[in-house]
Structures are given as structure tokens and as C-alpha cells.
A protein has these predicted regions:
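Aromatic-lined, polymer-binding surfaces characteristic
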Residues: 1-161
């Protein structure tokens, strides 16, 4: 990316084509961490290499991402709001869906729905379960994984709101 050397695009497009050949509702969907990493990686790669991708690759990649992102959105909508504890969602999955939403918001209409949901949820509940002193019970291990998400999301919300 930074060097603009063609070899990086060539390698990236091979990986993107491989990932778009996978069934987004199949084995790669079993684990939320793996699924969200595939979604985010494709979203960031398509954003970086947009001008170099041919229309078929763009379409295939966007379709793969949308199936995965809509899967998270539909699964968590009206569920996460009422769930007392689901820290992995807050630490990783919403973070990855957020990055995916930002990367695709000019290309995929659903991305604005994902982004709005995350924004409203973030304002209403973040940090999760910390609205009262002493409410955090998940331990320092979970706290340690959250700073990147907190910094990233807070900075982006300030820029786009």
C-alpha cells in the first residue's frame, strides 16, 4: 500500500478471491471471531485496493462482506441491547463491524444501517456495565483487550458525528 508496489496488490487480490470463494454461511461462519476477521479484512482490502480491482472482484468481495455483516447485524439487533454480558461482541465483533461499515458506507447502503446501530448502541451502553461504580466484573483480561476499540471508536465518532 505505502510503496504502491504491484506485488502487494497481486498477493492481496489472490487472498481476496480465495476468501470470496468460501461460503459465508458455511464453516467460516461457525466462529464469530473468524467470521468477523474475514469480514473486516475483506472490507479494508477492498477499500485500499478499490481502484485496482475489476468490477467482478469488487462485486464478489462486496457480496461476501454484506452476507457476513448482515449476519452479525441481524443476529445482534434487539438482542445485544438486552443482554447483560457479551464482552466478545464489545471487544471485537462490533469493532470489526464498525470498521467494515466505515469502509463500505459509500458502496453498500446497508453499511449505514450497521453504522447507525453501532453508534446508537455505543452511546447508550458503552462502556458496557460501567454505568455504576463497581459494575465491571469481567476481570482485567477483558479490560486489557478493549483500549484499541475504545480509542478507535471514540476518535471516529468524533470525526463523523
Amino acid at each position: 500500500m505505502l510503496t504502491k508496489e504491484q506485488k502487494y496488490f497481486n498477493t492481496s487480490v489472490k487472498w481476496m478471491r480465495e476468501a470470496t470463494s468460501w461460503d459465508p454461511k458455511g464453516l467460516t461462519r461457525i466462529n464469530d471471531f473468524g467470521d468477523s476477521m474475514i469480514m473486516e479484512s475483506l472490507a479494508l482490502a477492498v477499500d485500499v485496493f478499490w481502484d485496482q480491482l475489476n468490477p467482478k472482484d469488487r462485486s464478489d468481495i462486496l457480496n461476501q462482506i454484506q452476507v457476513r455483516a448482515n449476519g452479525f447485524y441481524e443476529h445482534w439487533l434487539n438482542y445485544l441491547e438486552n443482554r447483560n454480558s457479551s464482552m466478545h461482541v464489545w471487544q471485537h465483533i462490533l469493532h470489526r463491524l464498525f470498521l467494515t461499515s466505515v469502509a463500505l458506507m459509500d458502496e453498500v447502503p446497508d453499511a449505514l444501517n450497521w453504522l447507525e446501530y453501532i453508534y446508537e448502541l455505543w452511546l447508550a451502553q458503552h462502556p458496557k456495565m460501567a454505568e455504576e461504580d463497581g459494575a465491571w466484573f469481567n476481570g482485567t483480561g477483558n479490560v486489557g483487550t478493549r483500549p484499541a476499540t475504545i480509542r478507535m471508536a471514540s476518535n471516529w465518532w468524533a470525526k463523523i458525528s
